[in-house]
Amino acid sequence: MEDKELITNATQLLSELNKIFQSCKQGMADDIRLQELLNTTLQELKKAEKLDNSILIDLEKFYQRTSLLIGLGSLKLNDQARTAWRNYDKFHYEHVKHVLTLYGPVFGF
């Protein structure tokens, strides 16, 4: 996948998740956190002219934090929002994880 295509696809999937999420928000703290994560990540993607590691790190931060909110937090998604999240989850594992470059000490087990 080309750099610009990856940014475009990520923006499209996150915009879709954001749009669907608007219908199931309950105003709880985790809902607000997810909305802030979506807003900041979408802003960074819109500013991005080319794909670099900082964009990939932003996507990874969004992914990790949202996974925690969905898995361990009090965030409740309806079926449509959960499907939109699973679509982004699949995209993230197929196109972001293997391109992300880690620096510093990394321990593999």
Indicate where each model-derived feature is located.
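Intrinsic-disorder-associated interaction segments
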Residues: 3-6, 10, 48, 52-55, ...
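Generic hydrophobic segment detector
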Residues: 12, 52-61, 81-82, 103-108
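A sequence-composition feature that detects small, non-aromatic residues
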Residues: 10, 29, 48, 81-84
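Amphipathic alpha-helical interaction modules
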Residues: 24-72
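Amphipathic alpha-helical binding modules
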Residues: 66-109
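Short terminal alpha-helical segments
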Residues: 1-39, 96-109
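Residues that form generic nucleotide/phosphate-binding pockets
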Residues: 16, 20, 62, 84-87
